[in-house]
């Protein structure tokens, strides 16, 4: 299975040749937010978790006009196993503000789990709704008669959304492939073909290894690759965890930023986790701002009965 992991990573990175920006919310602590990228992750860890993220990108960014500011993103999610059915269920809501454009999505995921080899293979689907809102009052066209910007106020449109994925995890490694926005959805805010904004399909590949050099120390390298088949981006990083209680790490986002991460687990069962990520922008600081900040909180609910055996987590810090 390790060979399969390596081959899949190489094919994904080599086969995608153009690296540019793309349409997707961005998270530095991606290893704690797997459900967002892949519906097949629903219920895989065998415990019910509640997770919340808040991200402020390019903090302190000053726009040329008005008070649009930088990008800010919030996500809340529920991830729960359905042990008697060998399956899992997930819910998440994402709010992504990008200047005059706001993306809001609400999604429900279901995954079925199969024992394969020494691990678990999960197949998942996701259905939901994706909303885009354009605030025309924030646009300042060079040409006042530009037909693309003749709207007034805030205009919203809602479209159905569908995603699917596959996820495999064993005791010491995991890998998943998610396929997002599989329905061909178009947002047409002017009512004609002059301002089409399609919801583009994305492929996301995630993976990681769990290595314990000592009894209390765990090292977990991981990666995230995203593509719309025209462009791609990748994150690669490593976390070090001590005594299942505190962690720290670094990651690199291609042509974008260097990230530092810290976190701490509270209570006897380590059920409450608080994490923080700091991004330092590496390129084009004159057009952005130098830093971004991200906060993560996750809480694992107690097991409901003695028969609900917790599944071995891989890596164990993930939620």
What are these regions (language model features)?
Residues 1-6, 116:
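Positively charged n-region of N-terminal signal peptides that target proteins for export
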Residues 4-15:
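Sec-dependent N-terminal signal peptides
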Residues 20-319:
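Subset of outer-membrane beta-barrel
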